[in-house]
């Protein structure tokens, strides 16, 4: 007799990529869960603004008051992100300090996973890539450069580390496209790319930006606006 079983887990991409891993082909349906989008965030924290936002159809200009409220919500989303625990806590308590603690705990749990699930010889390089992400994205062009990890570093030394982070769903790699034509993969340059985090709020936390910086728009929209905006679009 067959039974329908629902399972949840993390690092599945890493587990399935291991040599010798067995899998019941054709018997499993996958559902990948991502951080909440901006729309889902609005629905969770401000149902009134969410309703107004969903009524925008592009046929008429957005009222100035509504536009201002949406910009403020966007700034807050850049700092909060879409990790479910962070959004849920903020929706209930509106405490930014608690949100930042949750984000830091998530980042710490990622680091613990590195040591738990990676071969010992690869651990240092995974940490080097991970710890360099915010600095890579803070640059003007935000292109990933191995030399920014360590002087004299080469691609072949860090390819497996980047692959692991991507398979784990912690970062996403975006290759440069030489020509905007389909299929995009035919015009992709694998040696020119950017690495983004899976959640813009976690990136904001890695930048050590406070919620006040996000809401006031000072440091957020001068030093790191481009990086956070690009990560938001990707997300």
Predicted feature residues:
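Accessory nucleic acid-recognition modules appended to NTPase machines
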Residues: 87-235
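Interdomain motor-coupling "hinge/lid" segment immediately C-terminal to the ATP-binding subdomain
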Residues: 9-10, 15-138
